[in-house]
Amino acid sequence: MENTIEVVSNLSSNGLLLKSSIKNENIVLLDMHLDIGDLKDLKNYKRSFLKNIGYNVDVVDYGNKIKFLLDNVRNNKKIRIWSSHKNSNEYMTVFYICNLLEKYDAELYVVYSDEISSEAKSVGELDKEEIKNVDALERKLLKEEIIMYSKTWNSLLNDNSDIRYISFDNTIKSCSYDYLEEKILNELKKYNEVRVGKFISNLKIDCIIDEIDYSEYRHPSGVRFLQYDRRGGQGCGSGRQRH
């Protein structure tokens, strides 16, 4: 693992790797929240909307982390991305890294949590024992795959909608906050009273939504329903719970 740089896209994934034998200095945390918000500022390796989802700064600069990643690629280090086909932010990170490194002759590998356990819809839902033999869990991306994922990233970048999510056909789709809010509010009109967790569960069953994390998807103007979960609702995350 000494010659491997690990790329993770959220704190829970970062925490999992730190519990394993992977050294902290080999981990690059790109918590960019690629599944929401305007992507255009990423050309400068920045995100400028994250205060809306709990960050205490207006702009987060990832320039140093990207420089570290590129320096290691130039030094022929292996790059391993931790991801999931069932988590839009983690899956988007694969597309982003492929686009970033397409012009380099980089060795890119991916570990998908849902290929290790069907219940693990995010890397952070794995247990450290499940990633002991990580070299046996990874798979190398072919050049053709890197090019394909890079094109997917460019397509999503050009579309640049408010939300990017994994649809039921396992592809990344885009939609606006207004579109999603309208669908949710129309569904909400069917109820006189309903618990947040139950309502979200029904939305998923009725294919109104799928794996969208409502604790994060908050309209900049403050969509009322999308804030309920942040104030203590059960949320819509599924998979294995850790206490």
Go through the PLM ranges and name each one.
Residues 24, 96-108:
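A short alpha->loop->secondary-structure connector
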Residues 123-197:
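A conserved mid-domain beta-alpha-beta active-site/ligand-binding segment of alpha/beta enzyme cores
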Residues 7, 77-88:
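Acidic beta-strand-to-loop metal/phosphate-binding motif
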Residues 112-128:
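Short, conserved secondary-structure transition motifs
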Residues 54-70:
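Glycine-rich, highly charged phosphate/nucleotide-binding loops
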Residues 198-212:
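Short helix-coil junctions and helix-kink-helix linkers
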Residues 1-58:
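A structured, charge-rich N-terminal accessory region that forms the first stable segment of a protein
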Residues 221-235:
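A short, conserved structural fragment
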